[in-house]
Amino acid sequence: MSSKIKGLLKARGPIKKIGVIGMGYVGIPAAVLFADAPEFDYVYGFQRDSKTSGYKIDMLNAGESPLKGEEPGLDELIKKVTGNAESDGDGKSSGKSVGRKKFECTSDFSRLSECDAITLAIQTPFKSREDLIPDFTPLIMGLRNAGRYLTPGTLVVLESTITPGTTEGMAREILEEESGLVAGVDFCLAHAPERVMVGRLLRNIREHDRIVGGIKSYGADGALPDGMDSPSTKRAMELYGPVLTKGELIPMSATAAEVTKTAENTFRDLQIAAANQLALYCEAMGINFYDVRRGVNSLKGEGITRAMLWPGAGVGGHCLTKDTYHLERGVKIVNTELGLNAGTKDSRMSPEPLDFPEGKESLYVLARQINDFMPHHMFTLTKSALRRAGKVLEGPENEIKIALLGWAFLANSDDARDTPAEIYYRLCKDAGADISIHDPHVLSYPGLDEGDTISQDFDGVIAGADVIAVLAGHKEYLTLKPEEVAKRVGVKCPVIVDGRNVIDPDMWIEAGFIYKGIGRGDKNVHRLILSGQHISKSPEMKS
């Protein structure tokens, strides 16, 4: 360890005060878990006081979570660490505040200068996926704020999913420029990617293994080892150790940590794409994907892994929809920069150029395209079902009403970031359909046409609907009774299109619905049942 950073960390002592920049799905649970750990004295949550998100400041300081949907334990923990919990010791309200206040949300970024450790949990979307151009604007703003108030011996950790090479590159440069300090010499810098899923945020942070990758430090003889021997890695492990209950710390280099996060999400996206493609094949062959899945997954034995995932109406969320492109961009950037840096203090063994089949598209990008296609397939199923009902979605005489159930991309959540429901909505709107949207958790969304809203009135949304399209697997949709829904819909030959495998096809077919479902080739062309009469399939009726 360089003598300077060693002395700075020794003088600073253990991490006691933490700043978390970004109060969203990642930053809020991380901040309150830090605050709940006895090893730490105080935590600041930093949030811009903007028109769109400034409301979070007052809510959090009042002990309220701005995140909707089901998040076990989060509401209670926020109340506890903000000093707003009320209990008489038996779990009953006494009207008295219990618990020491250890967390505060603020828009005053100058308080970063008080912190021993600063984490950044800020979204990193893409401006152009085709050209591999990310939108790092919010992250850059956060880094500039951190750098502006950075003091010697502070640890800075990027939790955001980022293009490999960002920590050692852009992040390091901005922090050094703003602070006048040198990373690895005057302050520590690491990447510790979040690995959370909405609906189980606290559990994921506590129980998942934590990847921790610090940058290199420099001594008199040049670069010192990175990975677990890096002082930045060791300091970051000190930060995350107290919040883990089952998870272990896994040290590595900063770039390896970046690749780990982008690769694990890319691989999951690839697995989902494999299930989606097989579901399309099963539809085309008139068989049930779920029978095939059960059969494939039944193969067990030493060294055998056949954990096929579920198909669906599309992949959403902030991570899987873009992390493939971070990985694709990263291999180009890191490979190039390592070659250019040969002979400098940053030099390592210059890598070979990427060797890949000429003219062939990345398997990962193709998988991403398949998953992006699935809401388009939902639209195709919708049109096909309407034709069986003698109705046409597209055309000048179109008066089709569609009830879209579930705007969130994830079941029982309010997270609608990059939701595939928006693609389906836009396709139907462009075809001239009238769309009503129901979601028990998502209250509003900025991308809707003027006059369109998201309602929590289920009966009002489905009334008069020619089509019910299920885009999210909320628990409220699992117990729907088809006979009751048919009465509320009140149209002849109602259609239901199941994009999340949440309903029993036979029950809905028996109730008179025309059914379509992803992967249900065995049911997508069924006998129509109208007023108790079975109507045989015919060439005109076949989808």
Region spans (language model):
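Structural/interface elements that position substrates and couple domains in central-metabolism enzymes
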Residues: M1-S543
